[in-house]
């Protein structure tokens, strides 16, 4: 039996912030001979994405409870019980040595199912403040890890697994030291874009003129509108794209990033070694603010919360960052990164499987 490969079930779903770090760990362990299956939901992004990465996926039926009506809340215990039962049946068939919860609604019933079968549960919290599912599961988990300090008081800080092409970028000194000309500003609103970035940055471009050149990722369906906004501000020379397929190339091009502060974005910016101006998404638990705070404290970034993200404030901030300052901030960002996060998470999974 000792010669048989170890088996891991990854539980993650809903958003790229949960799924992509899970994929990084899965590939790392598969390269070492592990068998990996995924637990997800059929109507979220993991259903298409995970099989494209050569990983088989099983589905349970579960969704979030926030913002749902009274009827949905009353039915919630039944739905959670049914999802737990589905997850139990899947795990009885696959017989994982360990399950890894990377967040999303699927982790709740999946983690409870594993615990009820005596399968150890390992958790990774990507955000600076713990999600509801992970708060519950932490009580039964064999090991809890966090990307940023503060989500769990005693958990080890291991960073977020990021893509290898971002980790492979040259260090800031090699990339940025000899640059001249306009400051290259990369504006990223995520795959859905960010309305405040799309509305504010064309006016910032007009204010800063030849001092900057901008590459603006508008998000789905907003490219024409944002191009029009730059043209209306007499700034048609700036590049606007709906999506950026090669983020590593975009980071390599940039001198500074203006963006939301989702967990994966913050971790990628640190790994790339880039200064950032963050505008956290306004959420009641201020999750994105807490994600960005370590880089601001390190002197690698500035946070402007949405009410403060005005044309004046953004223009003055960018104007105040000369090339020497940007290079110093970039080096501080890289120093704050945890480039071996994937290996650290995989090591914890291996240790729990051996125990």
Curated annotation (Swiss-Prot):
Residues involved in UDP-N-acetyl-alpha-D-glucosamine binding: 15-17, 127, 163, 191, 244, 263-268, 288
Topological category with respect to the lipid bilayer: Peripheral membrane protein
Catalytic activity line of the entry: di-trans,octa-cis-undecaprenyl diphospho-N-acetyl-alpha-D-muramoyl-L-alanyl-D-glutamyl-meso-2,6-diaminopimeloyl-D-alanyl-D-alanine + UDP-N-acetyl-alpha-D-glucosamine = di-trans,octa-cis-undecaprenyl diphospho-[N-acetyl-alpha-D-glucosaminyl-(1->4)]-N-acetyl-alpha-D-muramoyl-L-alanyl-D-glutamyl-meso-2,6-diaminopimeloyl-D-alanyl-D-alanine + UDP + H(+)
Matching Gene3D superfamilies: Glycogen Phosphorylase B
SUPFAM superfamilies the record matches: UDP-Glycosyltransferase/glycogen phosphorylase
Record keywords, A-Z: Cell cycle, Cell division, Cell inner membrane, Cell membrane, Cell shape, Cell wall biogenesis/degradation, Glycosyltransferase, Membrane, Peptidoglycan synthesis, Transferase
Localization in the cell: Cell inner membrane
Its biological purpose: Cell wall formation. Catalyzes the transfer of a GlcNAc subunit on undecaprenyl-pyrophosphoryl-MurNAc-pentapeptide (lipid intermediate I) to form undecaprenyl-pyrophosphoryl-MurNAc-(pentapeptide)GlcNAc (lipid intermediate II).
Homology family: Belongs to the glycosyltransferase 28 family. MurG subfamily.
Family matches, as NCBIfam families: murG
Name the record gives this protein: UDP-N-acetylglucosamine--N-acetylmuramyl-(pentapeptide) pyrophosphoryl-undecaprenol N-acetylglucosamine transferase
